[in-house]
Design a protein with these regions (language model features):
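Conserved alpha-helix/loop element of class I SAM-dependent methyltransferases that forms part
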Residues: 26-52, 66, 70
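A short acidic, Gly/Pro-enriched loop at the edge of an enzyme's catalytic core
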Residues: 112-121
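A short glycine-rich, Lys/Arg-flanked "PGG" loop and its adjoining helix->strand segment in the class I
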Residues: 137-152
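Conserved catalytic/acceptor-binding region of the Class I
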Residues: 152-239, 244-247
């Protein structure tokens, strides 16, 4: 039986136990996999040298389940701090008879509680959303510890996007400002996430070698596949973080309502 860590207060800016957040993450996982061109576009989906894989911050497990289904010979483990999301992921693994998909409740910012050399590939998406900037060195060293010699850590991060809508641009500016004030980004002014700018240095200092970077641009526009998913993701994200934005003094309830409603009109 998998051993779960007890839940403690975490740094995630969203409500990790929220059903709304669970639905948003499932939607976001589909959007990202589709927009990036598949589960492993950088490898042309060739995982012949991968036997054991870990997904850090797996949420409700959508990516893990997709990988486990596509690659039945690979053992895929997902960890997340949310007990509710892990229970959801386990239930779906059972329903889909995915015996190679495993899930555990764990805080990725603490010891990962796996033996050294456990995995061939460690995957993590949007780590900036739950990792204070001071925690990156220890987080990456822990990833290196559990990787086998020649193993891969695969990180996916995003930076701020631009839009033809001033209201959408304003919304997009608020998120890095929120993370900056929460101590999560490396930006000096909170105008962007910046994490990709410092990633190579962080990886090198943690002991990683053969560092490679693959830049991708995901088009989000009317008529483009995935547009409605992206709009829904934006809606739910900002509905959820609005109280925090106001509490931190980034905006006011009145300004938020005006900008948010204008953005909805602009993206219809």
């Amino acid at each position: 039986m998998p051993i779960d860590q007890p839940q403690e207060e975490n740094a995630y800016v969203m409500d990790a136990e929220s059903a709304t957040e669970m639905a948003r993450l499932l939607n976001q996982e589909r959007l990202m996999t589709q927009g990036m061109g598949g589960l492993f576009p950088e490898r042309a989906d060739d995982l012949s040298d991968i036997h054991d894989m870990l997904d850090i911050g797996c949420g409700p497990g959508g990516w893990v389940l997709d990988v486990a289904y596509a690659y039945p010979d690979i053992q895929v483990t997902g960890i997340d701090i949310s007990k509710r999301m892990i229970e959801y992921a386990r239930a779906h693994a059972r329903v889909q008879y995915l015996d190679n998909a495993h899930f555990r409740v764990k805080d990725a910012l603490k010891s990962l509680d796996f033996p050294d050399n456990s995995f061939d590939l460690v995957n993590a998406r949007f780590v900036v959303g739950f990792t204070p900037k001071t925690a990156w060195p220890s987080f990456l060293k822990e990833c290196l510890r559990i990787l086998r010699p020649g193993g891969i850590v695969r990180l996916t991060e995003a930076d701020t996007s631009s839009s033809t809508s001033l209201a959408v641009d304003q919304l997009n500016m608020w998120m890095p400002m929120l993370l900056k004030r929460a101590g999560f980004t490396f930006s000096p002014d909170g105008r962007s996430f910046v994490v990709m700018t410092v990633m190579r240095r962080l990886l090198r200092e943690a002991g990683f070698e053969n560092i490679q970077k693959m830049a991708q641009s995901i088009e989000i526009a009317p008529g483009v596949e995935g547009y409605s998913m992206a709009v829904d993701n934006t809606k739910v994200t900002f509905q959820t973080v609005m109280p925090t934005l106001v509490k931190m003094g980034i905006t006011t309830p009145e300004e938020f309502e005006h900008v948010y409603n204008t953005a909805l009109l602009d993206t219809r």
